[in-house]
A protein has these predicted regions:
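Conserved ABC ATPase "signature" region
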Residues: 55, 102-120
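Catalytic Walker B motif of ABC-type/P-loop ATPase nucleotide-binding domains
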Residues: 150-153
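Conserved ABC ATPase signature
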Residues: 125-129, 133
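Short, small-residue-biased leader/transition segments that mark boundaries at the very start
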Residues: 1-5
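A short, proline-enriched helix->beta-strand linker immediately N-terminal to the Walker B motif
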Residues: 144-148
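Conserved ABC transporter NBD signature motif
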Residues: 47-55
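Helix-to-loop junction immediately C-terminal to a conserved catalytic motif
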Residues: 39
Length: 242
């Protein structure tokens, strides 16, 4: 285990290395607030967040800075810099947070472009790419500094269903290959059922249920059942149409 949230003395949810951990729930349930808290944008009013057996609020400022260097973020939009090429976008965090040579940075960026299947577009600019290709570049940039944790905020927002599945599988593959603890905020049922290794359901700011994609459709948690039945895909699986 690399990370967990504690509510008073109980472990509310644990996030596992090499797994796609998902935070799901209706709009207003607290997914985005919790994700931002886990990233370290602000601290919790109560409860605890533990990284590698260390409680976040008890870390020194220097320790927090070092921890933040282990974190990669994939934003809801592409969040790419229009004035930088694809290669330049991936090199951006390396420019500011490493002492690597220009050759080393380019080598690492090209390696990552190959991993996300965008190796033939390194000299293009973001506005020359499709939404799916921009998202691939965003993934490459998010893991440019070899993070231990990857936070994804609605990574499939704005993508068509077919592209969403491709991005889901890419995130899952990267997570497992690099041994990253990935934490994803999503309401996309396809994503949940495709790659949800560990799922936490939030309801009114509380994690009510934790399980995986294999157990979620047989849940007896009433608020979770109501959430699932509000989704056409899940509803048709739970209650097949005649």
């Amino acid at each position: 285990r690399q990370m967990c949230i504690r509510d008073r003395n109980d472990v509310s949810m644990s996030f596992m290395e090499g797994e796609c951990n998902m935070l799901i729930g209706a709009s207003g349930s607290g997914k985005t607030v919790l994700l931002n808290m886990l990233i370290g944008l602000f601290e919790p009013d109560s409860g605890e967040i533990w990284y590698d057996n260390q409680e976040f609020t008890k870390l020194s400022e220097q320790e927090k800075k070092l921890l933040h260097q282990k974190i990669g973020v994939l934003f809801q939009g592409s969040a790419l810099f229009d004035f930088r090429t694809v290669l330049g976008n991936i090199m951006f965090p390396m420019d500011f947070l490493t002492d690597w040579s220009e050759a080393e940075k380019k080598e690492k960026a090209r390696y990552l472009l190959d991993k996300v299947n965008v190796k033939d577009s390194e000299d293009k600019y973001p506005d020359e790419l499709s939404g799916g290709m921009q998202k691939r570049v965003g993934i490459a940039r998010a893991i440019a500094l070899n993070p231990s944790y990857l936070f994804c905020d609605e990574p499939n927002s704005g993508l068509d269903p077919e592209t969403s599945i491709v991005i889901d599988r890419l995130i899952s593959s990267i997570t497992k290959e690099f041994g990253i603890t990935t934490i994803m905020n999503t309401h996309d049922m396809n994503s949940i059922l495709e790659i949800g290794d560990n799922i936490g359901f939030l309801h009114k700011g509380t994690i009510l249920w934790e399980g995986d994609r294999h157990s979620i459709l047989s849940t007896e948690c009433q608020p979770l059942m109501e959430f699932l039945c509000s989704n056409t895909l899940a509803r048709n699986i739970i209650r097949p149409q005649k």
